[in-house]
UniProtKB/Swiss-Prot annotation:
EC number: 3.1.-.-
Gene that encodes it: addB
Recorded superkingdom: Bacteria
Species whose genome carries this gene: Bacillus cereus (strain G9842)
Positions of [4Fe-4S] cluster binding: 805, 1129, 1132, 1138
EC primary class: hydrolase
Function of the protein: The heterodimer acts as both an ATP-dependent DNA helicase and an ATP-dependent, dual-direction single-stranded exonuclease. Recognizes the chi site generating a DNA molecule suitable for the initiation of homologous recombination. The AddB subunit has 5' -> 3' nuclease activity but not helicase activity.
Residues that, per the record, bind ATP: 8-15
Location of the UvrD-like helicase ATP-binding domain: 1-287
Quaternary assembly: Heterodimer of AddA and AddB.
Miscellaneous comment text of the record: Despite having conserved helicase domains, this subunit does not have helicase activity.
Record domain UvrD-like helicase C-terminal: where: 281-587
Keyword annotations of the record: 4Fe-4S, ATP-binding, DNA damage, DNA repair, DNA-binding, Exonuclease, Helicase, Hydrolase, Iron, Iron-sulfur, Metal-binding, Nuclease, Nucleotide-binding
Any one GO biological process: double-strand break repair via homologous recombination
Protein name, entry field: ATP-dependent helicase/deoxyribonuclease subunit B
Length: 1171
């Protein structure tokens, strides 16, 4: 029994010495005693390859490469102990979830924390850490007693409570495992116990290579190996000079020196002979003097400069994607020009979550074979999502999101259907469910679902059409496709008494859906498309899910569990599933995490993402215990994993390992922006390297090749897939500025695409975009007539929409596009309810020959309740009756109608104007409808402007009859003459024109009428702020002011007083007008003369004629207006259709100048020739 150390700096040949010794021993004595070669898990494959890579050693039974966990399996199979069921990480998380749920009421700190994402991952890691550091539940309990007895501050009490919770959960976890199961850490503990019994290990020659430190648990394994083995050789990365000095935590080799001393101490305790340490002083790894210099002087202060030709490249990139593309181009160059193999190259990084997806895509595009040494979660696979969402459907009462997450896995589809057809049908089915608010009991009820193409209050009495009946049948068929397997599962789960029976139900659910066959189809399809990685995913996921169900049954099979807990435990297990990495092929670029990688035999290393806070890593408090709490526990005798401070001290060693992996070339790069464009800073580590290599110039990587030299641009010509985008860049440049003579090689590249049989058709679609202009071509007269008909019949809002943006008008009224109908109460619905409610009250008053002024407060309240109750069942598929939230909203709406009724009552008392009619139609046909506003357009097409007027009021005096328009709005609104001039606000003046023009035909006495004005009435229930103790009368007066109607009224004092008979001087509380003492109007009055009203009405006609002419002539320009901070695009539903983009030459806003009303009025006069 002896111990031997092989030490040396990085690249000194420690592993090579050990491997050569083993190979020589195998060559001399192939059947001798066992040789164990122990390495970290991630080194096993490459070490195995290196061991048998010699010409003299092509295979061996005597020498085996193990990690600690694999050695545990080997020993337990030999001496016993492997019969207990292994539970993996998913099983651990499931068991912990069950324990936490059952312990929840007794937990102090973790009761609420258990609901947070990642809690069980952190808890599992904490328990694993306890085990690795030989901390038992009783140790934790004793620590809690100690902390609880001496905790005085809030922080101390929090730690005591946290430790209490941990010991409870840890103890329960260990009790659940004892005698039945083993987790990964238990195998190592069993290995410690069983090693003395192993004949396989007894007397073996043991090599331990690639480690920098050992946990207490691993150190105990090393102890037993030294006792059992003939000789143990351990390699450590240490400079021999360091051993001659006192240990200092700032030393580069501090961690490995501590490990050296700990192992020597163990050897002394066990009376193991310690052989003479073998120090390796040479640097055989480095073929580059620059890299040898970097290794030898890495920790030197001040930095030792290297003035020769350096094989170190430092780059900054415009963004993360540009950085990865730069790496890909350089890799291709190394392989093509320097005769590198892909396996000679490694890419190291730390923040893989930001890079891996981009690297998979780009390396595939550049035809670079690669292996990403990182396990991917299975959580996004359709099978995992199908199980999780199906259980959520059942436990969560059939919520919409859970149902359609399950649908979109496509595993509910029948096996024999055409996927594309079913996908399209399900999209329409989802639209139906959204529009009708389908969830909960409606899914499980046997009542058939109904389909009607209506939404407004006016469309509720229509008969069902054939198309509606056909759609209804399809919807009910699709409903059964979705619900039948889930309801069957739901019924079985209700009958299931134990976890085993529940797991059987899940298995039956998958089998009856033919999931294995569907996964096989997905696998075949992936293989046919050349995506072999995803092909194996479909195989793995089924095996892992079956294994998870088996583990669940083994652990908790006979226990009874509620459906909600079963769902939570199953979801926790599914979240922990990961795809196993397929071992790399013989020739691939290795992409690995800096912290976990153990590389050997690479010629070139690319270290990417070297940004501040990433390399070196910024301090982060993660996990169950903070740094301060770990230090408290450490001081009390419980050793745990290093704190953030200790980790930061070790960071220099990590970076040293990182830069000393390659033998010939080192590339260091960082992006200046992430994928979202957020600025990133280069790491201080880059500055250190620059100081060591002052001759190295910092290069810049960009995806814009225009500013690069010819030789640099040529490097961007790579595979056809990636080069096409750069050809497009150059052609765009040529299109604008012309090519420079020395860049004409891009024409050669272009000619490749247009002449290649393989790429001609593919590239034509891309290259055609070079001449793409985002302009809407004018419609022909024939197409325009097909779309809009021989008679254009449109509302005023349609005309206004055309003036806001002609393309939006085309999308809505030409193509009949509309947003997906969703079961929610929108502003139009609320507006519709307000209009209907006020009309019903007004109609009732007309029938009873009463006016608003006749109502009492109590009657206002009674009527508001009555009409809302009557309307609610008819609005938006009974949305106001669909939930408690909507019922509350119904009450709020009723209060608004009540308040509005009170205000209308007050207005009626103060006004000589009385309502003539409400919801007055024009151009609608039928009795009571006024004629439309008609136009004969120059091209022979007729146009009718139609609509419905909220309210028309009439007043009479000795000067005649006056009519005014009241428009109910659910938001504050005023009439802006600038918007009238630009055709953006035509509604009120159109209504006024319609009623005054048709007054003689419409009014009962057949008399003519003059315009009195147009006013907006804001329907709301305002909150007012009052100072001091205000009386109820004062509050009501202030509320009345909040209902002041804005708009434009006739500049006649008598007419204004008819609108507010309480007005003598000052401002009116009812309308936006006021009188001075001399009888003239105040400056803030919104007034117009009768002549000006006539001009405005003429201008409205003029504007409609222009709009009609443009519509019929096929104008569909993508030209939205912009005026100040208002723009047509702000609330437009068609932005994704028109693709309006200000960066394009053809896409610019029509900028409209904001004007004063007087200036706008003057321009309106000029247009129509008014005086």
């Amino acid at each position: 029994m002896s111990l031997r150390f092989v030490i040396g700096r990085a690249g000194s040949g420690k592993s090579t010495l050990c491997l050569r010794e083993v190979q020589e021993e195998l060559k001399q004595r192939p059947r001798g005693k066992t040789i164990l070669y122990l390495v970290p898990e991630q080194m096993t494959f490459q070490t195995q390859q290196a061991l048998i890579g010699s010409e003299d050693v092509r295979g061996s039974i005597r020498a085996q490469v193990f990690s600690f966990s694999r050695l545990a399996w080997k020993v337990l199979q030999e001496v016993g102990g492997a019969s207990r069921l292994h539970i993996d990480e998913a099983g651990v998380h499931m068991l912990l979830r069950k324990i936490v749920e059952s312990r929840k009421d007794g937990l102090s700190v973790f009761q609420k924390a258990a609901e947070q994402n990642g809690f069980f991952e952190h808890l599992g890691s904490m328990i694993a850490e306890f085990k690795r550091y030989n901390v038992t539940p009783s140790n934790v309990y004793e620590m809690w007693q100690q902390l609880d007895a001496h905790s005085s501050s809030a922080e101390q009490k929090l730690l005591a409570n946290k430790v209490y919770d941990l010991q409870l959960l840890y103890d329960d976890f260990e009790r659940a495992l004892i005698g039945k199961y083993l987790d990964s850490e238990d195998y190592l503990q069993l290995l410690v116990e069983k090693l003395p019994q192993s004949e396989y290990v007894n007397g073996a020659e043991i090599y331990i290579d690639g480690f920098h430190s050992f946990s207490p648990q691993e150190l105990e394994i090393v102890r037993q190996l030294m006792i059992c083995g003939a000789r143990v050789t351990i390699t450590l990365t240490i400079d021999e000079k360091t051993l001659a000095q006192p240990v200092n935590e700032l030393d580069l080799f501090y961690e490995t020196t501590l490990t050296y001393e700990k192992i020597k101490q163990v050897a002394r305790e066990e009376k193991i002979e310690i052989e003479k340490t073998i120090p390796l002083m040479e640097q055989p790894r480095f073929h580059s003097p620059a890299l040898a210099h970097l290794e030898a002087h890495y920790e030197a202060r001040p930095n030792e400069k290297f003035n020769g030709q350096a094989s170190v490249t430092i780059s900054t990139a415009a963004n993360l994607r540009a950085e990865v593309e730069g790496v890909a181009r350089e890799i291709r160059k190394l392989v093509a020009n320097e005769k590198y193999r892909y396996r000679d190259i490694a890419v190291l990084l730390r923040n893989g979550e930001s890079y891996y997806d981009v690297m998979r895509t780009l390396f595939t595009d550049y035809n670079i074979p690669h292996f990403i040494d990182e396990k991917r979660p299975m959580s996004h696979h359709p099978l995992v999502e199908c199980i999780r969402s199906a259980l959520e459907i059942i436990s969560g009462n059939w919520r919409y999101d859970a149902v359609f997450r399950c649908v979109k896995t496509e595993l509910l589809y029948p096996l024999d259907v055409r996927k594309e057809t079913m996908r399209e049908e399900m999209d329409k089915f989802e639209n139906y469910c959204l529009a009708y608010g389908v969830q909960g009991k409606r899914w499980t009820s046997e009542d058939p679902w109904m389909y009607r193409r209506y939404r407004s209050l006016d469309d509720t009495n229509g008969m069902i059409t054939d198309s509606e009946r056909e759609m209804e049948e399809k919807i009910n068929r699709l409903r059964d496709v979705v619900r039948t397997p889930v309801i069957r599962m739901q019924k079985r789960l209700k009958r299931a008494g134990t976890v085993m029976q529940m797991c059987e139900v899940v298995y039956l659910f998958l089998e009856e859906l033919d999931v294995p066959k569907k996964l096989e189809e997905l696998r075949i399809r992936a293989e046919e498309s050349g995506d072999f990685l995803f092909a194996t995913d479909h195989e793995q996921v089924w095996e892992e899910v079956m294994s998870l169900l088996d583990t669940f049954v083994e652990m908790l099979g006979e226990e009874k569990m509620s459906l909600s807990m079963f769902t939570d435990v199953m979801s926790t297990g599914l979240e922990a599933l990961q795809f196993a990495n397929i071992p790399p092929s013989l020739d691939q670029v290795l992409i690995a995490n800096i912290d976990h990688s153990r590389l050997s035999d690479v010629k070139a290393t690319f270290i990417i993402g070297v940004n501040e806070g990433v390399i070196p890593a910024a301090p982060m408090d993660e996990g169950m215990l903070s740094d301060e709490e770990r230090e408290v526990l450490g001081a009390a005798g419980i050793e745990l994993a290093p704190t953030t401070r200790q980790t930061l001290l070790e960071e220099q060693f990590v970076m040293y390992q990182m830069v000393t992996r390659a033998s010939e070339r080192l590339y260091i790069s960082c992006p200046l922006a992430d994928e979202e464009g957020k600025t990133l800073l280069a790491s201080s580590f880059i500055k250190k390297i620059k100081r060591m290599f002052p001759n190295v110039k910092d290069s810049f990587i960009t995806n814009d090749v225009n500013d690069l030299s010819r030789s640099e641009q040529i490097s961007y010509v790579a595979t056809p897939e990636v080069t096409l985008s750069y050809v497009m860049q150059q052609l765009q440049t040529w299109k604008r500025y012309g090519f420079e003579g020395n860049l004409d090689f891009w024409w050669d590249v272009y000619n490749f695409y247009v002449t290649s049989d393989e790429w001609k058709q593919k590239s034509s679609r891309v290259l055609s975009s070079l001449f793409y202009r985002n302009r809407a071509k004018k419609l022909s007269t024939a197409v325009s007539r097909d779309l809009y008909g021989d008679i254009i019949k449109g509302s005023v809002s349609r005309m206004e929409l055309f003036n806001r943006c002609a393309y939006a008008h085309f999308a809505q009224h030409g193509l009949s596009l509309r947003e997906r109908d969703i079961f929610k109460l929108d502003a139009p619905d609320i507006g519709e309810l307000f209009h209907a409610a006020l009309k019903k009250i007004a109609d009732k008053l007309l029938r009873e020959n009463r006016t608003w002024s006749d109502l009492s407060i109590k009657e206002c309240e009674h009527l508001s309740v009555l009409v809302i109750e009557e309307i609610a069942p008819l609005l938006q598929r009974q949305i106001l009756l669909s939930s408690n939230r909507h019922f509350y909203l119904k009450q709020k709406l009723q209060q608004i109608i009540f308040r509005t009724s009170i205000i209308l009552r007050e207005h009626a008392k103060s006004s000589g104007f009385v309502p003539v009619d409400l919801e007055v139609p024009f151009g609608m046909g039928g009795t009571g409808s006024l004629p439309p506003m008609e136009f004969s357009l120059p091209n022979g097409v007729k146009m009718e402007v139609v609509g419905r007027i909220d309210r028309v009021d009439k007043a009479e005096d000795e000067n005649g009859t006056f009519l005014r328009i009241i428009d109910y709005k659910s938001s504050s609104k005023a009439l802006d003459l600038t918007e009238v001039y630009y055709g953006l606000a035509l509604q009120m003046l159109t209504y006024l024109d319609v009623v005054t023009s048709n007054a003689q035909m419409w009014m009962k006495k057949g008399q003519a009428a003059s315009p009195a004005g147009v006013l907006y009435f804001h329907i709301h229930n305002p909150i007012v702020e009052m100072k001091g103790d205000a009386s109820e009368a004062e509050i009501e007066k202030e509320i009345l002011k909040k209902f002041k109607m804005k708009g434009l009224v006739l500049g006649d004092a008598d007419v204004v007083r008819l609108m507010d008979n309480k007005l003598s001087t000052g401002s009116s509380d009812i309308i936006s007008a006021g009188l001075k003492k001399d009888g003239s109007f105040s400056a803030r009055s919104s007034i117009a003369s009768e002549q000006e009203f006539n001009v405005l009405q003429k201008y409205v006609h003029h504007t409609f004629e222009n709009i009609g002419k443009d519509i019929t002539e096929g104008v569909i320009d993508i030209a939205p207006y912009k005026m100040g901070n208002k723009a047509a695009c702000t609330f437009c539903n068609f932005k994704s259709v028109c693709q309006f983009d200000e960066s394009l030459e053809d896409n610019q806003f029509r900028t409209l100048k904001d004007m004063k009303d007087s200036e706008a009025m003057e321009k309106i006069r000029e247009e129509v020739g008014g005086e």
